[in-house]
């Protein structure tokens, strides 16, 4: 599989490739200063400088089974990862931005990180408890987790709005996977999309005016890789939903927050099968 890391400008409607590799890489995050992308591959994390420099491995200590649920703190000082090295199930850890020893955040497993609150104090994630997929939040210092959803369908992929008022997530509670949102205190649950596509991984823009989502054909269950998918953009309330473009991807394309600091661009991964 060949991976193409690309950046799309929502103002011009143009995309550019910033890196291509024969390895599988996933889920690019923009750094808060916009100078590099953070992504995962082969259980590790890498920085891709956008000035054309070399890709650099991030020291994640003992955590060498990182998945594609990772990100950077709003102030740019820390990295959050989801890794299964220590327990055999995904746990959430925080480590310094330049690498170092991961600090365990979640005691309950498995847990998959997806969002960092704008004030830097809380994490949002998908936790699987008694075979139920639900949305949880927790302090960056660890401690007790707060459950926001309650076992209606599969609930996954939470990401905060820039004003901190909403957590967007995808849920199959009405059948087909759709985008929903809820206040961080667990009130105000609302359905945002209700069309005939399987909608995943809602990422509100830093400008708090648009939400990016990834959409599968309705026949697709879960969020597999290596399929034709669509990246779509909509207003915060789900209005003016439009397809930006189609690509070959899915799992790994935009699993986690991927907007540039200014909110005019986002990063993603497109995949190309390698012929034998």
Predicted features and spans:
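Beta-strand C-termini and the immediately following turn/loop, strongest in propeller blades
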Residues: 37-43, 79-86, 116, 124-130, ...
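C-terminal closing repeat unit and adjoining cap/tail of repeat-based domains
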Residues: 227-272
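Conserved beta-propeller blade repeats
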Residues: 22-37, 64-79, 108-126, 152-170, ...
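Loop/turn-rich, solvent-exposed surfaces of beta-rich toroidal or solenoidal domains
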Residues: 175, 196-232
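Structural motif
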Residues: 2-5, 44-46, 88-93, 132-136, ...
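Multi-bladed beta-propeller domains
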Residues: 8-24, 50-65, 95-110, 138-156, ...
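Beta-strand-rich domains and repeat architectures in extracellular enzymes and scaffolds
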Residues: 1-35, 39-40
């Amino acid at each position: 599989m060949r991976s193409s890391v690309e950046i799309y400008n929502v103002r011009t409607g143009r995309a550019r490739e910033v890196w291509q590799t024969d390895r599988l890489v996933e889920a690019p995050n923009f750094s808060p200063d916009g100078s590099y992308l953070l992504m995962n591959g082969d259980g590790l994390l890498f920085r891709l400088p956008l000035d054309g420099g070399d890709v650099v491995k991030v020291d994640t200590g003992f955590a060498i089974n990182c998945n594609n649920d990772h990100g950077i703190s709003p102030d740019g000082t820390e990295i959050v990862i989801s890794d299964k090295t220590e327990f055999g199930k995904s746990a959430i850890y925080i480590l310094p931005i330049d690498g170092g020893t991961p600090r365990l955040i979640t005691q309950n497993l498995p847990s998959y990180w997806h969002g960092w609150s704008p004030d830097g104090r809380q994490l949002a994630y998908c936790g699987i408890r008694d075979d139920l997929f639900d949305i949880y939040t927790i302090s960056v210092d660890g401690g007790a987790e707060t459950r926001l959803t309650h076992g209606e369908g599969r609930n996954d992929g939470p990401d905060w709005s820039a004003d901190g008022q909403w957590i967007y997530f995808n849920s199959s509670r009405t059948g087909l996977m759709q985008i929903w949102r809820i206040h961080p205190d667990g009130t105000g649950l609302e359905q945002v999309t209700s069309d005939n596509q399987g909608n995943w991984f809602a990422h509100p823009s830093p400008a708090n005016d648009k939400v990016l989502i990834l959409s599968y054909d309705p026949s697709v269950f879960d969020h597999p890789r290596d399929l034709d998918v669509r990246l779509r953009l909509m207003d915060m309330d789900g209005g003016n939903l439009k397809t930006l473009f189609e690509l070959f991807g899915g799992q790994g394309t935009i699993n986690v927050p991927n907007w540039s600091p200014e909110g005019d661009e986002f990063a993603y991964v497109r995949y190309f099968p390698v012929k034998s």
